[in-house]
Amino acid sequence: MERWATFDCYGTLIDWNGGIGRVLERLFGAARGGELLHTYHELEPQIQREDPGSSYRDVMAIALARLGAPADEEDALARSLPEWDPFPEAPAALEEAKAGGWRLAVLSNTDRDLLDASLTRMGVEFDRTVVASEIGSYKPSPAHWDEFFAQSGADREQHAHVAASLFHDIAPASALGLRTIWINRLGEEAEPQPDVELRSLAGLAESLDALVA
């Protein structure tokens, strides 16, 4: 029986806060850029709810416009996104899971070309990818998981979802009755409780094996 691990990408595998933060600091200065990162966190899901069919590239541009970025810089996040760094432990953790027989998939609130560029930085081949731009929906809507299970034929009892965002991933996956591993990089409080909590992806393969026997 195939075992599947699905992942969010940005914030879980790729340093989302670091990538966005650098762009905001360049556009608005170090002090204000740091303050605006929190506002950006609130704006992005709001824009996605307003138009679930919009591309992630457009979502980022609209968010920057609402923050007051110059018109010729509204594509700054999309331009920089392919250069955002993986978390240092991510490639090795994925390699270890894959070597242990896990099939890997990414469920991402982004566009196909942007995700493909990011995943080339991981050095690991993923077996499936589901992106918002192709299904017309953004997490926390369950459509990403619906599409993944339809494509892969995976057994839900042989699956776990791994992510850093409670709002976008852990809460909706838990509501679907799926096993979850929360990558709690910021030491936050969890509601709902994930099945497993890690501070990074280090030790992921061991946790997956223990969670899905």
Language model features with spans:
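Asp-based, Mg2+/Mn2+-dependent phosphohydrolase catalytic module
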Residues: M1-A5, N17, P91, E95-K98, ...
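N-terminal helical cap/lid subdomain that shapes the substrate entry/recognition surface
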Residues: M1-A92, G100, D111-D116
